[in-house]
Swiss-Prot record:
Amino acids binding [4Fe-4S] cluster: C123, C124, C206, C209
Main function: Catalyzes the formation of sulfite from adenosine 5'-phosphosulfate (APS) using thioredoxin as an electron donor.
Keyword Cytoplasm: yes
EC number, UniProt record: 1.8.4.10
Annotated catalytic residues: C232 (nucleophile)
GO molecular function, one term: phosphoadenylyl-sulfate reductase (thioredoxin) activity
Any GO BP: hydrogen sulfide biosynthetic process
Gene: cysH
Cofactor(s) the record lists: [4Fe-4S] cluster
UniProt keywords, alphabetically: Cytoplasm, Iron, Iron-sulfur, Metal-binding, Oxidoreductase
Origin superkingdom: Bacteria
The protein's name: Adenosine 5'-phosphosulfate reductase
UniProt pathway: Sulfur metabolism; hydrogen sulfide biosynthesis; sulfite from sulfate
């Protein structure tokens, strides 16, 4: 959807999202991805943080060569970059590597060193939200790996919705999957997984803001540990 989005475009996408949500309330991930492909053709993108390749594998089966968007913030673990490279070589996909306007060094020079510590919300905005917004402008829909079991903030995540924040249809294809569902798929299909998962990191983001979960906490309790912040701003709607 490389165009200037009109109000008519947005209304049409909203209506499509509403119909899809009503018709596919109990749909499987495969059904959701087929619906996405039937309605948007090649005009959608799959987002991945390279924690694992489950969603990537599912999407590639529906549309070989599908665009897979990866936000290269400049702060990722080496293991995450390695997983991205491995995923790109193993699966029939096209990785769209999205970087912020500024390198980490340039950002440090402009706003001060280690913005992730002094203002994590602004750091996420500059290195994730702004680049994502620009990248999504060329698509009519995006597919995410957001799951309801990730954290209380995601417990009611819809399968299909209109993303008001970014102006396109959003499909959370594996929103209903449990941790057991994920592991079963990985075991049965030999799906690539970020090695940090086996080291005790069930939710992986930028290295400075990712720790192992707190005792008794949800998978995302290791993100921005000690702060009230629980989301980076990508899933505001």
């Amino acid at each position: 959807m490389s165009r200037e989005t009109t109000t008519k475009d947005l209304d049409s996408l909203r209506a499509l999202a509403e119909r899809g949500a009503a018709e596919l309330q109990d749909a499987s991930a495969e059904e959701l991805l087929r619906w996405t492909d039937e309605n948007f053709g090649g005009n959608y993108v799959v987002a991945s943080n390279m924690q694992d390749a489950v969603l990537v594998d599912l999407a590639a089966q529906v549309r070989p060569g599908v665009d897979v968007l990866f936000l290269d913030t400049g702060y990722h673990f080496a293991e995450t970059i390695g997983t991205r490279d491995a995923v790109e070589s193993v699966y029939d996909i096209h990785v769209v590597n999205v970087a912020p306007e500024q390198t980490v060094a340039q950002q440090d020079e402009l706003v001060g060193k280690d913005l992730f510590a002094s203002d994590p919300g602004e750091c996420c905005r500059l290195r994730k939200v702004v680049p994502l917004r620009k990248s999504l402008a060329g698509y009519a829909a995006w597919v995410t790996g957001l799951r309801r079991v990730d954290a209380p903030t995601r417990a009611n995540a819809p399968l299909i919705s209109f993303d008001e924040a970014f102006g396109l249809v959003k499909i959370n294809a594996i929103a209903a999957w449990t941790d057991e569902d994920m592991q079963k798929y990985i075991d049965e299909h030999g799906t690539l997984v970020n090695p940090l998962v086996d080291e005790g990191y069930p939710s992986i983001g930028c290295a400075p803001c990712t720790a192992k979960p707190v005792l008794g906490g949800d998978a995302r309790s290791g993100r921005w540990q000690g702060l009230a912040k629980t989301e980076c701003g990508l899933h505001a709607s």
